[in-house]
């Protein structure tokens, strides 16, 4: 018989940087999950993606065991990395802070495709372009 699911926890954690400090510790502690075990498994799985923010969905079962699924980094983080910026514009409709090419947008769309609800790469690219626009990043091409 399958284990009973008691909850889901959604977090965004730096790759290879999970530790028991907030926000990870309190979120897992509330559900009774072994915090150190999660940190070890997450850090081992995401070591190759150092420096990126990785969204993770943790499924907690009634016997306090857990499984987790990592997602692709948020489009905003990938756009900032491609445009070599620290942060987006505070006023994206007035101040443009950087530019990315259509080729870079397509590359991000290819990476994000499994997590986006789009049929093709063009649809995914449109979503990434919308994110860029809301951050004050101009898409050229």
Curated annotation (Swiss-Prot):
Keyword field contains Ribonucleoprotein: yes
GO MF entry, a single one: large ribosomal subunit rRNA binding
GO cellular component: cytosolic large ribosomal subunit
Post-translational modification: One or more lysine residues are methylated.
Keyword flag Ribonucleoprotein: yes
Record-linked SUPFAM superfamilies: Ribosomal L11/L12e N-terminal domain, Ribosomal protein L11, C-terminal domain
Family: Belongs to the universal ribosomal protein uL11 family.
NCBIfam families associated with the record: L11_bact
Chain's role: Forms part of the ribosomal stalk which helps the ribosome interact with GTP-bound translation factors.
Subunit (UniProt): Part of the ribosomal stalk of the 50S ribosomal subunit. Interacts with L10 and the large rRNA to form the base of the stalk. L10 forms an elongated spine to which L12 dimers bind in a sequential fashion forming a multimeric L10(L12)X complex.
Protein name: Large ribosomal subunit protein uL11
Species of origin: Chlorobaculum parvum (strain DSM 263 / NCIMB 8327) (Chlorobium vibrioforme subsp. thiosulfatophilum)
